[in-house]
Amino acid sequence: MMLYGAIFGCVEAAVTIAAAMSCRNPFVAPFDKRDVADEARRTFALALSDHLTLLKAFDGWRLARGCGSRAEREYIRDHFLSRQTLVMVEEMRKQFRGLLRDIGFIESSGGGGSGGGGYGYGRNNNNNSNSSSGGGRGGEGAGAGGAVEHSSNVNGGNIQLIKAVVCAGLYPNVAVAPAALCPSATGNAPGKGPKGGKGGGGGAGGGKTAGEVSLVGRKGAMFLHPMTVNFDKKELDSRYGVYHEVVKTSKVYVRDMTTVTPLMLALFGGSLQVHHEKQAITVDKWLHFRAERRAATLVKYLRVHMERLLLRKITHPQEDVSSNGRDIIQASNLQA
C-alpha cells in the first residue's frame, strides 16, 4: 500500500492508513454513551470507507492539535477519540515514512514539518464528505519527521486513487455485496458471481441495509460489523469491498471496509485472465467482470505497465517515476 502510495503521489494518506491499521481503533465507545459515540464517529464518514473515515478523523486531530492543547482536548472529547492511540498512529507514521525514505521511495525536502505536500478532501468525495469534521488541511506537511517531497503527495486529495491504493494493500481480502444494494453502480455486473452463482452476494438486498445482508468472501459468507460506516447504508456505490480485519463470533464479521470498483480489483488484485470471446475478465478465478474487448485489452496493458513500474522503482529507488504514475492514473480514469 505504501509503495503504491509513493508511486502514485498519495503517500501521506497511504502511510496514515497503514499506521492506523497497525494500531487499535482510535474511536472509543463508553458503555453508557455508545449511541452518541457512534453518531460522532459517523460524522467523519467518507466515501463509503472505514479507512478513509479513520484518515479524516486523524487529519482533524492533527489540525486541532496545531491550534493548541485546548482545541485538541475538545476535539478528542467531542468525537470520542483516544489521544493515546492517535499519538501511536502518529509515531507509526513517522517510522513508516522513515522506512520509505531509507529505501529511496520518498525524499525529505528538508526543513520543518509544514509547507510540504499536504492532503485534503476538497474534491471527488461526494459520499458523506462532512468537511466540517476536520477534513482537508491541504497545506500541512509531514510533521516532525521531515516534510515529504511534493511529488510524493501531489495526489493526496484524490479519493478514488487513495481507495485504489487501499485495494492494493488489502487484497485478497474482498467481500462481495448483493447486486440489489448497488442499483446505480456502473461496471459492477459480473459475468457470474463468486462461487459460480448468479450475481453473487448471498442475499436479497432489496430494501435492506448493508448490515442486514450477507456478503460473499472467498471462504464463505460474512457480515458487516455494526461499527462499520456502511452498516446502515441501503445503497453502496459498488458491490465490492476490501477489508483488513474480521472477527468470528456466531458469524464472521468484517470490522472495516472500503468499497472499490471492478477496475481497482483488476489493476491491483491477483492473477488476471482476459476472456475476449466472453467479453469478460477474471481476477484470481473467482471475481468475474464483464469487459468489452477494447476495455479488457486496456486493463491488461495497464496491469502489465503498472507491475513493471513497481519493479522498476524497487530496483531503481532513486529514479523519479511520477510521470509514469500520472500516465496510469489518467489512462485508468482514477482522477480527482
State the predicted function of each range.
Residues 279-336:
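Long C-terminal appendages of very large multidomain proteins
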